[in-house]
Amino acid sequence: MAGVAHMGGVSPAVDCGPGGWLVCDFRKLGNFEAYAPYDNVSELTARVNDEGWDVTIINWLKVSRFNSKDCVFVFSVGGGNLEKNISANIVKVVQEAKRIGAKVVGVVAKDGGYTKEVGDAVLVVPTLSSERITPHTEGFQAVIWHLLISHPKLQVNPTKWESTK
């Protein structure tokens, strides 16, 4: 699961998992307000213990005033599937985003799951090898977020090595 971001009329970016790097890049290179809810382990464990895993992200977002100006960026291999009980927390965040009118974008694989089914803009990484779906997907996700944040319309601050001449 990745993030929610305030991007000019689009609100905060939130991230979990490998998307933490995306949140860092959005903040550092693009000056976007972006968050990684699972970076606060104390709050995460308190929420899991008291509320359950499936609602950890959505309840965290509610405290962050999640609204229709926000965009949820999902990085997931399967995109969430309630029937198979896989990444139900992602499904719940996507459901809430759609309910309040926030945008849902993502990079997923396989059939894309619930994220692909209802998302506003979702890329599906093609399966090159059924034995390497997860590493290929996560590798492509990193390429895609780096291409996104380095786009001239989004990147306002230079990367380190490019800034040294």
Place the predicted regions along the sequence by residue.
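Glycine-rich, small/polar surface segments that engage phosphate groups of diverse ligands
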Residues: M1-N67, C71
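Residue-identity detector for glycine
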Residues: G3, G8-G9, G17-G20, G30, ...
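Generic structural signal for well-ordered, non-membrane alpha-helical segments
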Residues: D15-G19, D50, D54, I86, ...
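Short alpha-helices
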Residues: C16, R99, V108-K165
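C-terminal binding/interaction regions
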Residues: V63, S68-V125
